[in-house]
C-alpha cells in the first residue's frame, strides 16, 4: 500500500514539472481572459474524460470556492438526444465537431480531453475549432498524441497509464478553476468567502 501511494506521488511530481506548470499558468490566463471578454468554454471527451468535462463545466457554471456569478461552460457529452441522433444518422466521429459548429462563436475556447491523445471525435472537434478560428486547449497523456498540432494551449504529460493521467487531469483542472475564479472575482472586491 505504501509503495502504491509513493508511486502515485512520484508520478504527480514528475508530471507537474516546471514546463508543465508554465503551460498551466498560460492556460489559466487565456481562460480568464476569454471569460472576461464574454466568451464561453466548450469541453469534450469520452468516458472518464467526458465525466471530467462535466466536472469542469459544473465548477465554472456553479462555483469552485467563491460565491460569484456563473461562467459560461458547456460539456458537449451531456445531451443524449443529440449524441445518439447524430451518431445514429451520421457518425460518432463527428458528434462533438457538429456541436462545436452549432455553439461556437469567435473568441470561444474548445477544451479537448483525451487520455490517449488519439480519440477520433475529440480530434475532429479540435479540427472544427481550428477551422472556425477558436482557441484550443488540449489535455492528454502520451505527450499529446494526435492533439499536438491542433492545440494552442497544451497540457500534455508523458504518462501512458490512463488512471494516472486522469489523476493528473483532475489536479490540473481544479487548479485552473481555482485560479480563474480568483483572477476574475477575488480581485474585483466581490465576496471571497469559501463555499462549504
Swiss-Prot record:
State its cofactor.
Zn(2+)
Question: InterPro entries from the entry?
Answer: GmhA/DiaA (IPR035461), Phosphoheptose_Isoase (IPR004515), SIS_dom (IPR001347), SIS_dom_sf (IPR046348), SIS_GmhA/DiaA_subfam (IPR050099)
Q: What is the UniProt remark on how the cofactor binds and its stoichiometry?
A: Binds 1 zinc ion per subunit.
Q: Which reaction does it catalyse?
A: 2 D-sedoheptulose 7-phosphate = D-glycero-alpha-D-manno-heptose 7-phosphate + D-glycero-beta-D-manno-heptose 7-phosphate
Which Gene3D superfamilies would you find in this protein's record? Glucose-6-phosphate isomerase like protein, domain 1
Q: This protein's superkingdom?
A: Bacteria
Question: EC?
Answer: 5.3.1.28
List keywords of the entry alphabetically. Carbohydrate metabolism, Cytoplasm, Isomerase, Metal-binding, Zinc
Q: What class of enzyme is it?
A: isomerase
User: Any remaining note in the record?
Assistant: The reaction produces a racemic mixture of D-glycero-alpha-D-manno-heptose 7-phosphate and D-glycero-beta-D-manno-heptose 7-phosphate.
Role summary: Catalyzes the isomerization of sedoheptulose 7-phosphate in D-glycero-D-manno-heptose 7-phosphate.
Q: What is this protein called?
A: Phosphoheptose isomerase
What's the source species' lineage? Answer: Bacteria, Bacillati, Cyanobacteriota, Cyanophyceae, Oscillatoriophycideae
